[in-house]
Design a protein with these regions (language model features):
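Beta-lactam-recognizing serine transpeptidase/beta-lactamase-like catalytic domain environment
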Residues: 2-13, 92, 214-219, 223-225, ...
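Periplasmic/cell-envelope proteins involved in peptidoglycan metabolism and beta-lactam response
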Residues: 2-297, 322, 397-407, 517-518, ...
Length: 603
């Protein structure tokens, strides 16, 4: 209505005249009209301001969103670094494989794509059809495809089908050192062992390919393509020696079969610096198929979750599990007694076959008793009642002090994940009985590698080293990138006590309980142990022996543990001979020559 003239003639109305004549306009309508006009103006102003903000302050954000709509990104996988032994022998490598994927919007002949991929990849047609017809930016059909098959698929030149090169982790020795090396997952990321611990160095950095697509999602042929090249991972050189690892594994298998044991572990280490030359845990598992059980499950296992069974199969007994060390721990009690001066080499103890502490009767393994013996022979004889007395003299405070000095109250810091810690009474809760049983290696639990580390410190002059596998990483041209350093605590014990203990432990092998580790022409030191497994009275044992060579200048130390052997279970009888056989084969290999035969064996 064209407003010409208006008069207020009635309450709430205006008389308005236009070209058609006069008419009445409700003033309430007028207010609504004004409100609508003002609202439209305000909304328009707001939108203009918002558009201005978008065009200025947020322009980069929306440009990025637009780019994302038209750019398609594909990864170029980095080659994972290899794992090698100390001599450059490859333990973990890579095999070129392919990843086959489809881009739905680019497919021109769905039926042909489905037929070719199902046939070449040996996949069910329905599964391929579902993925090909799925509307998504990219759909993976299959990974870890053999390169030869990937090359065949490329020859079809199928629109919308991408065949990208990838890498698959392979382990040339299958089961060798499986519980040390670990393995990688589908994305080539380390899951267990050294693969996981050194993943940052091994993984490298993936590259990428960026291509442009039109509004329909079709890749524009000949469009600008940006490539960011991958950075390959670094090679990891380890302390392992393949030849020693092979022999230790073979020996462990033979022992497990012979003794019908649950498992057998052998560790070989340099006591002067903590470099681990071998760590065998049998049964091992196949690194190239780590999700397949290494045994046929019995009825009881069949009821368990498979992941629980796999996790148990992957466990490294040497570091993931604890046990009561038994008589090998007597080396610690003896060391503490000498260091504190509460016992001298000429001190004697008379063993009658048992001793009583509070209300507890503690027996000696020789039920008729050892009679009177000096300190040195209490170690040779591994006499429990004698060590109860030496432990009493040392006292709780000093026992814990020297356990700490020898690394038994803390984790070793070994470069493998999942290391277990010590299980022990709080110091203030240790009474006479607890101290007595601790003195000969019961009532607390440690890992095998903790025990090996402690004995190494006792015989290497008193230096507490860090057991480890990693030496250094190198680039593809062989140049060293990262050299790993490990802590060493000097003077954990005095060099004088260390010298004394070396001589005593040499006597254990030459004339004490460890004679089955004796090798003519070599000076070997060591200590045996037979540990009862909990609960007491179960009839289950862990038999073990730690031996070092040579006794006067230890260059190598080895530990053998036999878990739940059948029949004879004494450590000196079944574990010591394993270390003897090991040393007969590896000592010449590492350059430790046999001395002139001892006179007592000349005839």
């Amino acid at each position: 209505m064209l407003l010409i003239k208006c008069r207020r003639l009635k309450r709430g109305y205006l008389l308005m005249k236009d070209g058609m004549g006069f008419g009445w306009l409700n003033t309430g309508h007028r207010k609504k009209l004004v409100f609508m006009i003002v609202s439209v103006l305000l909304v328009s102003i707001f939108e203009c301001v918002r558009l201005g903000i978008i065009m200025t302050a947020k322009s980069e954000y929306y440009m990025q969103k637009a780019d994302e709509l038209h750019q398609r990104e594909r990864k170029i996988k980095a080659k994972r670094g290899r794992i090698l032994d100390r001599n450059g022998i490859v333990l973990a490598a890579n095999e070129v494989v392919c990843t086959v994927s489809v881009i739905h919007s680019q497919i021109e002949d769905e039926e042909k794509v489905i037929k070719v991929l199902a046939g070449e990849l040996d996949i069910d047609v329905e599964e391929v059809t579902k993925k090909v017809k799925k509307v998504s930016s990219m759909e993976y059909i299959k990974t870890n495809v053999a390169k030869e098959i990937g090359d065949e698929i490329r020859k079809y030149n199928l629109a919308g089908v991408k065949v990208d090169e990838d890498y698959k982790r392979v382990y040339p020795y299958d089961e060798l050192a499986s519980k040390v090396l670990g393995f990688t997952g589908a994305d080539n990321q380390g899951i267990l062992g050294l693969e996981a611990k050194y993943d940052t160095y091994l993984a490298g950095t993936n590259g990428q390919i960026l291509t442009l697509s039109d509004a329909g999602g079709i890749e524009i042929k000949g469009s600008c393509e940006n490539r960011v090249l991958p950075v390959d991972g670094q090679d990891l050189y380890t302390t392992l020696d393949v030849n020693i690892q092979k022999y230790a594994t073979q020996l462990a298998w033979e022992t497990m079969v012979k003794k019908e044991a649950k498992q057998v572990s052998i560790i070989v280490m340099r006591p002067d610096n903590g470099e681990i030359l071998a760590m065998a845990n049998v049964p091992e598992y196949n690194l190239n198929s780590p999700y397949e059980l290494n045994y046929e499950p019995d009825e009881e296992d069949a009821q368990k979750d498979k992941m629980d069974l796999l996790n148990n199969m992957w466990r490294n007994f040497c570091i993931n599990d604890t046990y009561e060390p038994g008589s090998i721990f007597k080396t610690v009690t003896a060391t503490a007694a000498l260091e504190t001066g509460v016992v001298g080499l000429n001190d004697s103890f008379t063993c009658s076959g048992a001793t009583v502490v509070s209300d507890r009767r503690i027996r000696c393994h020789k039920t008729t008793g050892h009679g009177t013996q000096d300190f040195t022979h209490t170690v040779y004889n591994s006499c429990n009642p004698a060590f109860v007395e030496w432990g009493r003299r040392v006292g709780t405070d000093n026992m814990y002090l020297y356990m700490g000095k020898l690394g038994l109250l803390a984790k070793t810091g070994i470069d493998l994940s999942g290391e277990a810690g010590t299980i022990i009474h709080k110091q203030e809760n240790v009474g006479a009985v607890e101290l007595a049983t601790m003195s000969f290696g019961q009532s607390f639990q440690i890992t095998p590698v903790q025990m090996l580390r402690a004995v190494s410190a006792i015989v290497n002059g008193g230096r507490l080293v860090t057991p480890h596998f990693g030496l250094y990483t190198s680039s593809s041209d062989g140049s060293v990138v990262n050299e790993f350093a490990y802590s060493t605590q000097d003077e954990a014990i005095s060099s004088q006590t260390s010298e004394t203990m070396k001589k005593i432990l040499e006597g254990v092998v030459s004339e004490g309980g460890g004679t089955k580790a004796y090798i003519d022409g070599y000076s070997i030191g060591g200590k045996t142990a037979t540990s009862q497994k909990l609960p007491r009275g179960s009839g289950k044992y862990i038999s073990s022996f730690i031996g070092f060579a040579t006794a006067d200048n230890p260059q190598v130390i080895a530990m053998c543990l036999i878990d739940e052997p059948k029949g004879v279970y004494y450590g000196g009888t079944i574990a010591a001979p394993v270390v003897k056989t090991l040393y007969e084969n590896i000592l010449p290999y590492i350059g430790i020559e046999r001395a002139v035969q001892l006179e007592k064996n000349d005839d």
